Amino acid sequence: MTRKNTTTNPWAKFHGPNLGYVIEQYDLYVTGAGSVDPELQELFEIFGAPSFQDDVVTGDNTATHFSPQNTGNIEKILKVVQLVEQIRSFGHTLAHINPMEDAANGQSLLERAMNELSDADLKAIPAKTVWQDAPEGIHTALDVIHRLKEVYTQSLAYEFSHIQDSEERAWLHQMVESNSLRQPLSNKKRTALLKRLTAVEGFEQFLHKTFVGQKRFSIEGVDMLVPVLDEIVLEGAKNGVEDVMIGMAHRGRLSVLAHVLEKPYSHMFAEFKHAKIEGAVANSGWTGDVKYHLGREQVVSNEEVSTRVTLANNPSHLEFVNPVVEGFARAAQENRKKSGLPEQDTSKSFVILVHGDAAFPGQGIVSETLNLSRLNAYQTGGTIHVIANNAVGFTTDSYDSRSTKYSSDLAKGFDIPIVHVNADDPEACLAAANLAIQYRMLFKKDFLIDLIGYRRYGHNEMDDPAVTQPQVYKKIKNHPTVRAIYADQLQAAGVLNADEIETITQFTQEQLKSDYAQVPPADTSDATIHVKVPDVVAKGIQPIDTGVELDSLRAINEGLLSWPEGFNVYPKVKKILERRKDALEENGKIEWALAESLAFASILQEGTPIRLTGQDSQRGTFAHRHIVLHDTDTNETYSPLHRLPNINASFSVHNSPLSEAAVVGYEYGYNVFAPETLVMWEAQYGDFSNTAQALFDQYVSAGRAKWGQKSGLVLLLPHGYEGQGPEHSSARPERFLQLAAENNWTVANLTSAAQYFHILRRQASILGTEAVRPLVLMTPKSLLRHPLTLSTASQLSEGRFQPALEQENLGTKPNKVKRLVLSTGKMAIDLAAEIESGKHEYNLDEIHIVRIEQLYPFPAEKVQSIIKRFKNLEEIIWVQEEPRNMGAWHYMAPILFELAGDKVKTGYIGRPDRSSPSGGDPFAHKAEQELIVAHALDVKYNFRQDKLEIEVFSN
């Protein structure tokens, strides 16, 4: 028998879904239809059925009482609770968020639930029963349903149910349900909004009529993108944000430049006319780029606040700008002027990424970048994503461009709140912008706005979209612009009359005409097929002494080999480190990793911050670096480079996610925005770097020539043929050499620890100067500890990086030398090792070997001076381990031909042309490599009897 307690009612604490659960459990308890939690069962025995005495205000203002056990409405209460949650979760399926469609028809789930409840049923249930925080004036469940449908099924639609954090989810629902987002705008702000839309539309239409047939990638159809960006930028400024970084593609870019970044109309028109105009600041490199790829930096302000806005330069490779801009933001957020890790303040800057509806789900770089959003090494405290959704990608309809309902669905997997908004409802768009910036500033996480509009013209203005989308373009042709829609709304509301609206339009037109009148006639006098590279770039990097005093190096080494008392270093690692103790003494030898650590420390002591990332960079792919130590008992980490004396610059080394493209883009962006920092990206193996090829092609190699965007990014690409197969042998140096021109970067493949030490220090010395350029290093694997790559302390304390090195003990009898062998990297060491081994007999008097340490720019003067010493030289041979159609041969061949002149032959020794970089059989590899070495050194036996085919000579 139930024992009722009339003094305390525990059920009063339950509301909404929790209430529904309790009622459902009581029903099971009474009917015996299922098992009930023992604690709940005890409560039912003590207190009886859940009883909720609540006043329900009816239509005649009389109050009735509601109690589930008295009315038998348990099932109806459950249905109401479920309906409330379904509206919150699936209201977006009913919302009118697409201006080209009527209200959504995908209503089945919600419609069925609503049809099972009559208005009378809903009126009988008090609001508090299903919505604990129901606003004032909401009395019954019917009021609740009407209110929630108003919130969730209009021109703003929300997807929050996938958010895992209950606090965030509750905050989001409270924000949209409390009416705080949709407070009426003041007449002043409404008028300003109409003026902005008039300016955007007027600018686009002026371009359309004045520059007929020229590409501009119009914003028309998602015109509200500009006011949305305005709102986010200025609200961010009110929150103290110093830098707003924007990444976007070409669609709408000109309007964003002109309005959000305040680029004068006259400057825009001058670019269309190819005219020179006074005051225009060149923001491109010597080759330049099309106008809708260029970026801009501008301080944006109103009467209250100001902030710096940066629109990143961008290629037409959609979405690849995303990680670049994230790198901008992280660089702006960090203080790198102290030792240890940089100090990050995510409130100093944030990112806005404008995506395309086809590109957001279509380009893998998007998900790679989203994956960075909460990683310690890459998070920027939240990005605001805006999908400029015009429902078509070039000529491809959305049903052919994605496998999901919404273009934004990818974001759900990264726990990102999503708001869909009709781009024809300006005030709803601003509400979405406000929610986005508030969420970002409070929770430091990403937020996405799906701005759903249309594209008034074709992909570009020379396209006829009716060819592929005839029906929708019939609609678009007759569809009013958002400016016209909003003007009518303001006129109907009495905010403005027709004359005032016309005055706004005329003012915009007069401004456009006036600015156009300032533009002089076209001037093509400087158009030339001979593009002049700036002198400072053309002359290359000048020789720089990079030695460090021996006493300083010894002090650094001592610091590198110390750690806090009680810190338990892994025994194997401890032995590796202890072997370095005497490396700088008289008979000591310095291996690759120690040379790197010494270079890092000396660079830090000179005030240059360092950032190194890669998939295994803390330890090193080949267990060689150990720059971050792990305590075997606590797993705490320690880096000696954080505790060295006399350092006023930060050092950070991070293991990256299993991603190349996004991480390379991020590090490039970081370096562009922090030019004083030595930023390095290390591939796990150089073979995998080609998944970032678009970044190398569009940004790292060409960014300065196209946009004047300087970078000193260092790429560390493990490279070398060691019989490990086609996926662990080649960093594809041929691709970097093919991109090499105009001194755009340095490509090197080194053979000693000292050379690595000096080239790192040289790179650090040019950061922040006009001489800066990226550095592409083919780094070693098996050579990391090879005896022939070790260096002495004096080789670090004296001198500088040498672009070419001569093999010791060769060429001592110049008149006898007939063959000059050039090689690089591991191939050069294999040749040296064979000579040192003494296994075979060579006529070494007739051979000289030069190691080309710096492949690009090629050290022509140095090599030419060597050639001149050998009066009887007959041939210059390039020897490589890569197949003939790969590696450096096709880059080197014309260089050697020019160096050799008419009397000296040039040739190639190496593997023949192949489609795969390397074979998979380590024994075949070893035999091939031995044969290449033998040919190069001309060992005395008949090679032609060998079954392996080797390209011996090419004239």
From Swiss-Prot:
Molecular function as annotated in GO: oxoglutarate dehydrogenase (succinyl-transferring) activity; thiamine pyrophosphate binding
Cystine crosslinks: none
Entry EC number(s): 1.2.4.2
SUPFAM superfamilies (UniProt xref): Thiamin diphosphate-binding fold (THDP-binding)
Reaction it catalyzes: N(6)-[(R)-lipoyl]-L-lysyl-[protein] + 2-oxoglutarate + H(+) = N(6)-[(R)-S(8)-succinyldihydrolipoyl]-L-lysyl-[protein] + CO2
GO CC annotations, alphabetized: cytosol; oxoglutarate dehydrogenase complex
Cofactor(s) it depends on: thiamine diphosphate
Superkingdom of the source species: Bacteria
Alphabetical UniProt keywords: Glycolysis, Oxidoreductase, Thiamine pyrophosphate
InterPro entries associated with the record: 2oxoglutarate_DH_E1, 2oxoglutarate_DH_E1_bac, DH_E1, KGD_C_sf, ODO-1/KGD_C, THDP-binding, Transketolase-like_Pyr-bd
Example of a GO biological process term: tricarboxylic acid cycle
HAMAP family (alphabetical): SucA_OdhA
PANTHER family attached to this UniProt entry: 2-OXOADIPATE DEHYDROGENASE COMPLEX COMPONENT E1 (PTHR23152:SF4), 2-OXOGLUTARATE DEHYDROGENASE (PTHR23152)
Role noted for this protein: E1 component of the 2-oxoglutarate dehydrogenase (OGDH) complex which catalyzes the decarboxylation of 2-oxoglutarate, the first step in the conversion of 2-oxoglutarate to succinyl-CoA and CO(2).
Oligomer status and interactors: Homodimer. Part of the 2-oxoglutarate dehydrogenase (OGDH) complex composed of E1 (2-oxoglutarate dehydrogenase), E2 (dihydrolipoamide succinyltransferase) and E3 (dihydrolipoamide dehydrogenase); the complex contains multiple copies of the three enzymatic components (E1, E2 and E3).
Record family assignment: Belongs to the alpha-ketoglutarate dehydrogenase family.
Protein name: 2-oxoglutarate dehydrogenase E1 component
Organism: Bacillus cereus (strain ZK / E33L)
Lineage summary: Bacteria, Bacillati, Bacillota, Bacilli, Bacillales
